[in-house]
C-alpha cells in the first residue's frame, strides 16, 4: 500500500495541448486543462505550453483548484552545445520550479534528438552517443544535479524515445556514469515498452534512484504499425501509440506493487499524449484516475 501522505497523483497537460505539435489541442485553454484535471480527481500537473510563466498568476489559478506543479520538462544540450548555455537556461528553469514549490526537475538530453522530427523514423534513425558525448552528458548532469541540490531539489532524467538515452542499456550506462546523489531517474512505463524493454527490470534495478514516475500506457498494435511503416515519434503519437493507464496493453498492477513495497515517495503522473480530437482529454483523465484508484488504492 502506498503512503497516501507521501504519494501524489497528477496528470500532464499533453493530453489537452501538445508541446511538440501545438496544433493538437490548440483550442484548449490553460484554464480548461487544469479545471478538467481537478474535476477528474488529480492534485498536480506538469507545465505545458499554455501555462502562464508568471508564478503569481499560475499559483492563484492552481490554488483555486487545489492543484500543484509537480515538475516541468527541461531540454538539455550537453552533447551538442557548450555546457554554459544549458546551465544558464537550467538555472532559470530551476528557479521557476522552486517558486512553484516543485521538488524535482525533469531533464532530457535533446542533443541529436529526433523525437520532434515529423518525417524521421523513430527506430531506424535513433541517435547513438559517442563515448565523448556520454562523458559530456554525465559531467553536465552531475553539475546540474548540484545546482538543483542547492535548492533542495532533485534532477530526474527522462529516458525517451528518439533520444540517446532510450534503451535499458543506455539507462544503465547513464546511471553508472552519474553520481547517484545528484542524478536520479524518471521512470516512464510507456517509453520503455515502446522501445521494446521490460519496464519491471528497470523498475527493480533502479527503485532507489527513481524519484518521479510517468504512467503511460501503450497500444501494441499501433507500435507494430509504426515499426512496419517506419514512422516517426510524432506520427506514432498522432496514430495513437500512447494512451492512459488501463486503456492499453501494460499491466500496471506489478508496477504499483513494486513502488509501494519499496516505499516510493513522490508523484505518480499520468502522461499520455494523444490527439484530443480523437481521445477526449476529460474522458481519458477520468478513466485513468479510476484505474489508478482500483489498482493502486490511492
From Swiss-Prot:
<dbReference type="GO" id="GO:0050114">
    <property type="term" value="F:myo-inosose-2 dehydratase activity"/>
</dbReference>
<dbReference type="InterPro" id="IPR030823">
    <property type="entry name" value="IolE/MocC"/>
</dbReference>
<dbReference type="GO" id="GO:0019310">
    <property type="term" value="P:inositol catabolic process"/>
</dbReference>
<keyword id="KW-0456">Lyase</keyword>
<dbReference type="InterPro" id="IPR023952">
    <property type="entry name" value="IolE"/>
</dbReference>
<protein>
    <recommendedName>
        <fullName>Inosose dehydratase</fullName>
        <ecNumber>4.2.1.44</ecNumber>
    </recommendedName>
</protein>
<dbReference type="InterPro" id="IPR036237">
    <property type="entry name" value="Xyl_isomerase-like_sf"/>
</dbReference>
<dbReference type="InterPro" id="IPR050312">
    <property type="entry name" value="IolE/XylAMocC-like"/>
</dbReference>
<dbReference type="GO" id="GO:0030145">
    <property type="term" value="F:manganese ion binding"/>
</dbReference>
<dbReference type="InterPro" id="IPR013022">
    <property type="entry name" value="Xyl_isomerase-like_TIM-brl"/>
</dbReference>
<keyword id="KW-0170">Cobalt</keyword>
<comment type="similarity">
    <text>Belongs to the IolE/MocC family.</text>
</comment>
<keyword id="KW-0464">Manganese</keyword>
<comment type="pathway">
    <text>Polyol metabolism; myo-inositol degradation into acetyl-CoA; acetyl-CoA from myo-inositol: step 2/7.</text>
</comment>
<dbReference type="Pfam" id="PF01261">
    <property type="entry name" value="AP_endonuc_2"/>
</dbReference>
Amino acid at each position: 500500500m502506498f503512503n497516501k501522505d507521501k504519494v501524489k497523483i497528477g496528470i500532464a497537460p499533453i493530453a489537452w495541448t501538445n508541446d511538440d505539435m501545438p496544433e493538437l489541442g490548440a483550442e484548449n485553454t490553460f484554464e480548461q486543462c487544469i479545471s478538467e484535471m481537478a474535476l477528474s480527481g488529480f492534485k498536480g500537473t506538469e507545465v505545458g505550453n499554455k501555462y502562464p510563466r508568471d508564478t503569481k498568476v499560475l499559483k492563484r489559478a492552481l490554488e483555486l483548484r487545489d492543484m500543484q506543479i509537480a515538475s516541468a520538462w527541461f531540454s538539455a544540450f550537453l552533447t551538442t552545445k557548450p555546457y554554459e548555455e544549458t546551465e544558464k537556461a537550467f538555472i532559470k528553469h530551476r528557479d521557476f520550479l522552486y517558486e512553484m514549490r516543485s521538488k524535482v526537475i525533469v531533464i532530457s538530453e535533446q542533443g541529436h534528438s529526433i523525437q520532434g522530427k515529423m518525417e524521421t523514423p523513430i527506430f531506424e534513425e535513433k541517435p547513438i552517443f559517442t563515448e565523448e558525448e556520454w562523458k559530456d552528458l554525465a559531467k553536465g548532469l552531475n553539475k546540474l544535479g548540484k545546482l538543483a541540490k542547492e535548492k533542495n531539489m532533485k534532477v530526474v532524467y527522462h529516458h525517451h524515445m528518439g533520444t540517446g538515452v532510450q534503451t535499458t542499456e543506455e539507462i544503465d550506462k547513464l546511471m553508472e556514469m552519474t553520481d547517484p546523489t545528484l542524478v536520479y531517474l524518471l521512470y516512464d512505463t510507456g517509453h520503455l515498452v515502446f522501445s521494446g524493454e521490460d519496464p519491471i527490470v528497470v523498475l527493480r534495478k533502479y527503485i532507489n534512484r527513481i524519484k518521479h514516475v510517468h504512467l503511460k500506457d501503450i497500444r501494441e498494435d499501433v507500435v507494430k504499425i509504426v515499426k512496419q511503416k517506419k514512422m516517426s515519434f510524432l506520427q506514432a503519437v498522432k496514430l495513437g501509440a500512447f494512451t492512459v493507464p488501463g486503456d492499453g496493453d501494460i499491466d500496471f498492477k506489478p508496477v504499483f506493487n513494486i513502488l509501494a513495497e519499496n516505499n516510493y515517495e513522490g508523484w505518480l503522473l499520468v502522461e499520455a499524449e494523444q490527439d484530443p480530437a480523437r481521445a477526449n482529454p476529460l474522458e481519458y483523465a477520468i478513466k485513468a484516475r479510476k484505474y489508478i484508484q482500483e489498482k493502486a488504492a490511492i
